[in-house]
A protein has these predicted regions:
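N-terminal positively charged helical leader segments and presequences
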Residues: 1-61
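Active-site/ligand-binding-proximal alpha/beta "capping" segment
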Residues: 162-210, 214
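RNA substrate-binding interface of SAM-dependent RNA methyltransferases
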Residues: 14, 41, 69, 74-168
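Amphipathic alpha-helical repeat scaffolds
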Residues: 5, 95-103, 212-218
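General small-molecule cofactor/ligand-binding pocket signal
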Residues: 45-49, 143, 162, 202
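Structured adenosyl-cofactor binding patch, chiefly the S-adenosyl-L-methionine
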Residues: 68, 106-110, 119-136, 192-231
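Short, hydrophobic beta-strand segments that form beta-sheet elements in well-ordered domains
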Residues: 2, 22-24, 142, 160-166, ...
Length: 231
């Protein structure tokens, strides 16, 4: 995959991700010295290209002048190893890349054990997702799974499923040691199978008549409440 932009490339280099090569626009090299130094420390090959040629390869509207070829893919449920107490943030067909990236960033910041992207969710490796995650995907376990596989994993590993639903009460006391908070699609919400498997439905109290919250915002509030109850 390709990581583009000074911040994202530096995050990949600092997180120890396998960066195979860097491409730098010739006119931007002087402004990218910290990135070039980090690449040199890692022994990463750096190629230079004229600005016009670089811009043709870049995906952003205003390219900053650096992109990296990175070997990174989400993990599978078989790769997940949970401690005695662990919280997972699970995305059920969340389709907006900005929401997916924001949720990964939130899960990392709040100390979740992993973010799980169920089938129908935007590709966690897409550039827009990685950019919204602000490098968190390189430091925080991100898993792709079909619902059936995750449900089997949860059952086998004593992971209780909590479903984020509009109009429900916020997380209360009595959090299980292992917990998966599942947030649904921006429009359709959670699939019926998730609701059927959920031990509890939780939500964010809102004023009457208020529009529903953005999926990433609701996830951040609920995950904070869940994690706060663990301390």
């Amino acid at each position: 995959m390709v990581a583009e932009g000074r911040r994202l490339v530096m995050d990949a280099l600092e997180a120890g991700v396998n960066v195979k090569a860097l491409l730098v626009a010739e006119d931007a090299a002087g402004q990218l010295q910290p990135v070039l130094e980090a690449a040199a420390r890692r022994g990463v090959t750096v190629e230079r290209a004229p600005r016009r040629a670089f811009n043709e390869l870049a995906d952003t509207e205003t390219p900053s002048g650096v992109l990296a070829v990175v070997e990174w893919r989400p993990k599978t449920v078989a790769d997940l190893s949970l401690g005695a107490r662990a919280t997972l943030l699970v995305l059920d067909a969340v389709q907006d890349p900005g929401n997916v990236g924001g949720m990964i960033r939130t899960a990392y910041a709040l100390g979740a054990a992993a973010t799980v992207a169920l089938d129908g969710t935007a590709d966690p490796g897409a550039h827009k997702v990685l950019r919204a995650a602000m490098g968190a995907a390189f430091r925080h376990p991100v898993v792709e799974a079909r619902w059936a596989d995750f449900a089997a994993f949860a059952q086998a590993n004593d992971v209780a499923i909590w479903a984020a639903c509009q109009g429900r009460e916020p997380p209360a006391e009595g959090r299980p040691d292992r917990l998966a908070l599942v947030v649904g699609n921006e429009g359709a919400g959670l699939r019926p199978e998730v609701l059927a498997a959920a031990a509890r439905q939780v939500g964010v109290p809102m004023q009457p008549g208020a529009e529903s919250l953005n999926a990433a915002t609701a996830a951040a509030i609920l995950l904070y409440e869940v994690m706060r109850g663990r301390h």
